[in-house]
Amino acid sequence: MTDLIQLKMIIEKAFNNHDSLNTATKGEIRDSVEYTLNLLDKGEIRVAERQENGQWHVHEWLKKAVLMSFRLNPMHIISGGANESFWWDKIPSKFSGWQETDFKKANFRSVPGAIVRHSAYIASNVILMPSFVNLGAYVDEETMIDTWATVGSCAQIGKHVHLSGGVGIGGVLEPLQASPTIIEDHCFIGARSEVVEGCIIREGSVLGMGVFIGKSTKIIDRSTGEVFIGEVPAYSVVVPGSLPGKPLPNGEAGPNLYCAVIVKRVDQKTREKTSINDLLRD
């Protein structure tokens, strides 16, 4: 099966009747879902792609295939736990059945404790510290996923990205039309930061430690006063901040509310030549 148009038609039709699917479903539907997940796993297709105009196009049918796999796959024993223990899940490890030759061909590092679920793509020269990459995600070349970082379902991580320790990149499977969380090329995401709900961090941006960005987070450019929602502009340097709250009924000052603050914007050359710590100093 090589025709993506035909594959998409089968997935779309099956999803319209997904309530009828179960672990006993065989034939064309199961074969198509498994084939689609294998293509995602190899990086031959991806849930979202950046267009020439900078906008991201979401392939909803691929998310549908991922969702249907939960109905089709039975729970089963997954080996590899500590002290010869097991897990109990529907989605196998990406590395299930891999041998030394498979890892050499894939050409990325996977440190003990790294968990990657089948259908997530890991590109060449990626480093996976003890971390978690969920199904349908895409991690591009020469990116570092540091210790205890999490890449959510269908998230798109660009080239030369550094996700620091404890970073959380949210997954977005539903609603189907929603964009996944996206970290574009050459971004640095500081320790314990969270980017969720389909937000986009544009190319070359730096998020300091402990920055939290969701769809309702106000992202304020300190120099211009401009407010962004759901997207950090390219080559922005962002730190945690707060906004004055509304007065309380008794007239006293209300509690401040969290926001993210763009403290500066840099061009590509400055970003390449300047250390992260220097960029975050003010």
Curated annotation (Swiss-Prot):
GO BP: any one term: lysine biosynthetic process via diaminopimelate
Domain of life: Bacteria
Cross-referenced Gene3D superfamilies: Hexapeptide repeat proteins, Tetrahydrodipicolinate-N-succinyltransferase, N-terminal domain
Binding site for substrate: R109, D146
EC number: 2.3.1.117
Pfam families tied to this protein: Hexapep_2, THDPS_N_2
Record's GO cellular component terms: cytoplasm
GO molecular function: 2,3,4,5-tetrahydropyridine-2,6-dicarboxylate N-succinyltransferase activity
CDD domains, alphabetized: LbH_THP_succinylT
Catalytic activity: (S)-2,3,4,5-tetrahydrodipicolinate + succinyl-CoA + H2O = (S)-2-succinylamino-6-oxoheptanedioate + CoA
Pathway this chain belongs to: Amino-acid biosynthesis; L-lysine biosynthesis via DAP pathway; LL-2,6-diaminopimelate from (S)-tetrahydrodipicolinate (succinylase route): step 1/3
Stretches of the chain forming a coiled coil according to its record: none
Record's subcellular location: Cytoplasm
Keyword Protease assigned: no
Main location: cytoplasm
Keyword set, alphabetical order: Acyltransferase, Amino-acid biosynthesis, Cytoplasm, Diaminopimelate biosynthesis, Lysine biosynthesis, Repeat, Transferase
NCBIfam families attached to this UniProt entry: dapD, PRK11830.1
Self-association state and partner proteins as the record states: Homotrimer.
UniProt similarity note: Belongs to the transferase hexapeptide repeat family.
Protein name, as recorded: 2,3,4,5-tetrahydropyridine-2,6-dicarboxylate N-succinyltransferase
Native organism: Bartonella bacilliformis (strain ATCC 35685 / KC583 / Herrer 020/F12,63)
